[in-house]
């Protein structure tokens, strides 16, 4: 099975940690795993890029502004069309939006999986124009999720949040796991 994960950056956070564990499990099952990164990593934060490269994961970096770059859309479309992935798995709102826009024009019907890693608009302050635009964007994005093959939430709380955005979505809960064997924070 050929899978492409799409994510905003590889700076380690919750979504990126989950992605790394998921990719390691997929590699153990001998899947052909690729990662498309929309934006650049912040040099002041830890990146999981070296861990992915060490495991032989093909990484494509678009290196443009994370969402509003026409060339990034064209490059991602070309990659998806040429590679003919069985699954395209997006991991954050910007990634979801780009995959939604591009997938409509792909000749092969790859399955699109969306992972929702948190309640994205709930940390915003009220009243700010930019925050109101983000909330509007999330409501619109939840309508785009209807065309996904599967929507995965990390918790029941996130599932409820998604369903409040769009009651027509069928959301599956798959909680994060902790890889104790590879964790430095746990003692055996």
Q: Residue locations for each model-derived region?
A:
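Membrane-interface segments of envelope glycosyltransferases acting on lipid-linked substrates or membrane lipids
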Residues: 1-188
């Amino acid at each position: 099975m050929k899978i492409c994960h799409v994510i905003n950056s590889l700076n380690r956070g919750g979504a990126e940690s989950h992605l790394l564990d998921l990719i390691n499990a997929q590699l153990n099952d001998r899947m052909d795993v690729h990662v498309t990164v929309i934006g650049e990593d912040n040099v002041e934060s830890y990146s999981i890029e070296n861990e992915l490269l060490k495991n032989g994961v093909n990484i494509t970096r678009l290196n443009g502004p994370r969402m509003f770059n026409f060339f990034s859309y064209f490059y991602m479309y070309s990659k998806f069309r040429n590679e003919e992935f069985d699954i395209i798995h997006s991991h954050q709102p910007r990634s979801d939006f780009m995959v939604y826009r591009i997938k409509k024009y792909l000749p092969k019907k790859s399955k699109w999986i969306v992972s929702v890693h948190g309640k994205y608009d709930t940390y915003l302050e009220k009243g700010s124009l930019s925050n109101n635009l983000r909330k509007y964007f999330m409501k619109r994005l939840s309508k785009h999720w209807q065309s996904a093959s599967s929507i995965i939430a990390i918790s029941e709380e996130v599932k409820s949040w998604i369903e409040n955005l769009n009651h027509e979505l069928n959301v599956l809960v798959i909680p994060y796991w902790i890889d104790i064997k590879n964790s430095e924070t746990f003692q055996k």
